[in-house]
Amino acid sequence: MACARPLTGRTLPADESPCLTLILEPVSGEAAKNSTPVVVDKPGKPPPKRHRRQYNVTVSCNDCDKRLNFSVKTTCSTILTLQQLLTEDLDFLCSFCEAKNG
């Protein structure tokens, strides 16, 4: 299956929304104990690994327009999801602006 190439050269307009901090933490033992148990069948053959490629991503800081570069290694479907986040709902800050807005 051919993967659609994401539009990575897009410059996003400045947005006046407040900054959002996303903190990802593993589920604690207490929360896991209170959850509904999941019945798992005998493990069979593991699913085949999906083909992952490396992508270089450039975005602009939402405050000062500094170019921020990073690389990801993921599948075609996931890079398209990342593209959607970058162009619609996700703002990046450089380290200087993050400290300034702290």
From Swiss-Prot:
Residues annotated as signal peptide: none
Protein encoded by which gene: E7
Cellular component aspect of the GO annotation: host cell cytoplasm; host cell nucleus
One annotated GO molecular function: DNA-binding transcription factor activity
Domain of life according to the entry: Viruses
Quaternary structure annotation from Swiss-Prot or TrEMBL: Homodimer. Homooligomer. Interacts with host RB1; this interaction induces dissociation of RB1-E2F1 complex thereby disrupting RB1 activity. Interacts with host EP300; this interaction represses EP300 transcriptional activity. Interacts with protein E2; this interaction inhibits E7 oncogenic activity. Interacts with host TMEM173/STING; this interaction impairs the ability of TMEM173/STING to sense cytosolic DNA and promote the production of type I interferon (IFN-alpha and IFN-beta).
Family, per entry: Belongs to the papillomaviridae E7 protein family.
Annotated GO biological process: DNA-templated transcription; symbiont-mediated perturbation of host cell cycle G1/S transition checkpoint; symbiont-mediated suppression of host innate immune response; symbiont-mediated suppression of host type I interferon-mediated signaling pathway
Protein name as annotated: Protein E7
Location in or out of the cell: Host cytoplasm; Host nucleus
PTM entry text: Highly phosphorylated.
Mapped zinc finger ranges (unnamed): 61-97
One Pfam family from the record: E7
Motif Nuclear export signal positions after renumbering to this chain: 79-87
UniProt comment concerning the protein's domains: The E7 terminal domain is an intrinsically disordered domain, whose flexibility and conformational transitions confer target adaptability to the oncoprotein. It allows adaptation to a variety of protein targets and exposes the PEST degradation sequence that regulates its turnover in the cell.
Function, in words: Plays a role in viral genome replication by driving entry of quiescent cells into the cell cycle. Stimulation of progression from G1 to S phase allows the virus to efficiently use the cellular DNA replicating machinery to achieve viral genome replication. E7 protein has both transforming and trans-activating activities. Induces the disassembly of the E2F1 transcription factor from RB1, with subsequent transcriptional activation of E2F1-regulated S-phase genes. Interferes with host histone deacetylation mediated by HDAC1 and HDAC2, leading to transcription activation.
Record has Zinc-finger as a keyword: yes
Annotated organism of origin: Odocoileus virginianus papillomavirus 1 (DPV)
Positions of region (E7 terminal domain): 1-36
Record has tRNA processing as a keyword: no
Record keywords, A-Z: Activator, DNA-binding, Early protein, G1/S host cell cycle checkpoint dysregulation by virus, Host cytoplasm, Host nucleus, Host-virus interaction, Inhibition of host innate immune response by virus, Inhibition of host interferon signaling pathway by virus, Interferon antiviral system evasion, Metal-binding, Modulation of host cell cycle by virus, Oncogene, Transcription, Transcription regulation, Viral immunoevasion, Zinc, Zinc-finger
